[in-house]
From Swiss-Prot:
This is Transposon Ty1-NL2 Gag polyprotein. Induction: Ty1-NL2 is a weakly expressed element. Induced under amino acid starvation conditions by GCN4. InterPro entries: TYA. Residues 1-23, 48-60, 71-97, 129-152, 419-428 have a biased composition (Polar residues). Homotrimer. The keyword RNA-binding applies. The record marks H401, N402 as: Cleavage. The gene is TY1A-NL2. It comes from Saccharomyces cerevisiae (strain ATCC 204508 / S288c) (Baker's yeast).
Length: 440
């Protein structure tokens, strides 16, 4: 009796259970031979209905929602969602397909992980050439890179180079302002050098030392995204990424050029503020130097107006050009070209006066002889003697005798001798007398 009662109630209970099933398959342990044919048909209809309901259900509703991948976008969006950094995966070069998501300007569309969350890139091979970060879970980006001795696999190598395979490379800081981008690039380049990737950094001519590989480009692309958020990038960087969102090498090359340009700007400002000119160099060369500096500064966004430029130029003038400070200081609308017209006029006048002066140069040996012969600065007295003295050389006694004999002759000559000594004495040269000029 009990077995018959169980067999009578079991189909009813089984049928009620089957009516509430909504899964793909109906599982039962009861022998289908114990069920009547009408009940079997009912079971088949219920199973068919359940299958038809499942086919119309969206695939997303059958998958439980992951709370870690919650996205602010709508459910109809089929693009990758923006989730927290620790829950997303590193992007590979093959995944960076423009047809899947947009360029780097929308980083929320590109999944990647922070540098601390995944091992650092190293090329395939038996020995790793690059240090690796430990894959710790939940490490925020603001957490500094491990630097203590406990994080190293070999504590005895604590004083070795940063590029050792048993040490960790300190990541660059996060970019927080577009104005700090060039300074951030310096730290990012240092980060690449410490990671044994210095060969891919563009040089002064804009080309790297060696060709970058696909894996290195992927690492460069991902690390740049992590530490340089798009909202803090300058406009010129966004313009490059809008054309090719993976061209990080071009960004580094342009950054190095801008760094050199900034250094040149500082040098130009210092040169312009310390100008010196005294006519020792041609005026054309001086004008070319100054105008090139002013043009470079104006092209780089540092505008130097005529008033400031003229003041800097006139402050460096010296010599004959110094008076231009006072003749032109009241001309407020004076231009640099007008100032250089005055400088050219003075320079040409100097050159003309130098060419017109005769150039007499004495023999250096004569100057030495003169300095040795004459020590006194006064000119020595020159005595001119009568050339007939050598032919009529007589003694003083003979000349005195002739004078005494001439006094005995009665002539007008005696009267002339007896005249006052203040009058000039005129003697006839009858007796062959020769007097020195200084005896008068």
């Amino acid at each position: 009796m009990e077995s018959q009662q169980l067999s009578q109630h079991s189909p009813i209970s089984h049928g009620s259970a089957c009516a509430s099933v909504t899964s793909k398959e109906v599982h039962t342990n009861q022998d289908p031979l114990d069920v009547s044919a009408s009940k079997i048909q009912e079971y088949d209809k219920a199973s068919t209905k359940a299958n038809s309901q499942q086919t119309t259900t969206p695939a997303s509703s059958a998958v439980p929602e992951n709370p870690h991948h919650a996205s602010p976008q709508t459910a109809q969006s089929h693009s990758p969602q923006n989730g927290p950094y620790p829950q997303q995966c590193m992007m590979t070069q093959n995944q960076a397909n423009p047809s899947d998501w947009s360029f780097y300007g929308r980083p929320s569309m590109i999944p990647y992980t922070p540098y601390q969350m995944s091992p650092m890139y190293f090329p395939p091979g038996p020995h790793s050439q690059f240090p690796q970060y430990p894959s710790s879970v939940g490490t925020p980006l603001s957490t500094p890179s491990p630097e203590s001795g406990n994080t190293f696999t070999d504590s005895s190598s604590a004083d070795s180079d940063m590029t050792s395979t048993k040490k960790y490379v300190r990541p660059p800081p996060m970019l927080t302002s577009p104005n700090d981008f060039l300074n951030w690039v310096k730290t990012y380049i240092k980060f690449l050098q410490n990671s044994n990737l210095g060969g891919i950094i563009p040089t002064v001519n804009g080309k790297p030392v060696r060709q970058i590989t696909d894996d290195e480009l992927t690492f460069l692309y991902n690390t740049f995204q992590i530490f340089a958020p798009s909202q803090f990038l300058p406009t010129w960087v966004k313009d490059i990424l809008s054309v090719d969102y993976t061209d990080i090498m071009k960004i580094l090359s342009k950054s190095i050029e801008k760094m050199q340009s900034d250094t040149q700007e500082a040098n130009d400002i210092v040169t312009l503020a310390n100008l010196q000119y005294n006519g020792s160099t041609p005026a054309d060369a001086f004008e070319t130097k100054v105008t090139n500096i002013i043009d470079r500064l104006n092209n780089n966004g540092i505008h130097i107006n005529n008033k400031v430029a003229c003041q800097l130029i006139m402050r460096g003038l010296s010599g004959e050009y110094k008076f231009l400070r006072y003749t032109r200081h009241r001309h407020l609308n004076m231009t640099v070209a007008e100032l250089f017209l005055d400088i050219h006029a003075i320079y040409e006048e100097q050159q003309g006066s130098r060419n017109s002066k005769p150039n007499y140069r004495r023999n250096p040996s004569d100057e030495k002889n003169d300095s040795r012969s004459y020590t006194n600065t006064t000119k020595p007295k020159v005595i001119a003697r009568n050339p007939q003295k050598t032919n009529n050389s007589k003694s003083k006694t003979a000349r005195a005798h002739n004078v005494s004999t001439s006094n005995n002759s009665p002539s007008t000559d005696n009267d002339s001798i007896s005249k006052s000594t203040t009058e000039p004495i005129q003697l006839n040269n009858k007796h062959d007398l020769h007097l020195r000029p200084e005896t008068y």
